[in-house]
Amino acid sequence: MPQRPARLAGYSVFAAMLASAGLPIYIHAPKFYLDEYGLGLTALAGVLFVLRLFDLVQDPILGWLAQVARTWRRPMVGGAVLLLAASMIGLFAVTPPIAPIWWFALTLTGLFSSFSLLTICFYAQGVMKAKAASGGHLQLASWREAGSLIGISVAAVAPVALAALTDQPFALFALLFALLGGVALWAMRGEWTGGAVQTASVSPLLVLSDPMTRRLLVLALVNAAPVAVTSTLFLFFVESRL
């Protein structure tokens, strides 16, 4: 039975929220902290490199946590959205109460961690949703990817557009993002039913012991690394060379 659009729209809104959170991490935040606080590219690159290594370790753990605590998925997602919004506001709208480089690292840690957990829970919930209806995978993917495209497009141009309204466009962007997080939670309010799947919990270390899984992870690393690097350097290249 096909899903009604009203039930799938929440997935589109949530995907837009996640997509609009991912872009500032690589494109906006490094340039913002260089311009506002004079941090050097070497220091910023070092923080991002360490955080990505941390993310590499924590993602399997977060996946395991999302599985074993699936009956608590609704409050877990709510807490992660709250952390995501607070980290975004702290990154762009709060004057660093400590050394800017450490504040940059702290708020990005919150962003990376909450973003990863939400992405894992969101896609896991999407699989469960799609299995409940005939043709559900294609329908849900269409709504989800449309939301992601809208979210990343809006996040790319929002700071420039908001500069016409305020002299602190990134602070306003962060506040609007927090509002979007609340809307996304409301739109998905009836969807977090993590207790429906009864599968055995698998340790992240056991998953990594599989040769095929390790090869897929290496392939994912090779695929993602150029995207992250070019995204981070894009604004610096435009300013310096174009």
What positions do the PLM features span?
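Membrane-embedded alpha-helical bundles of multi-pass transporters/translocases
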Residues: M1-L242
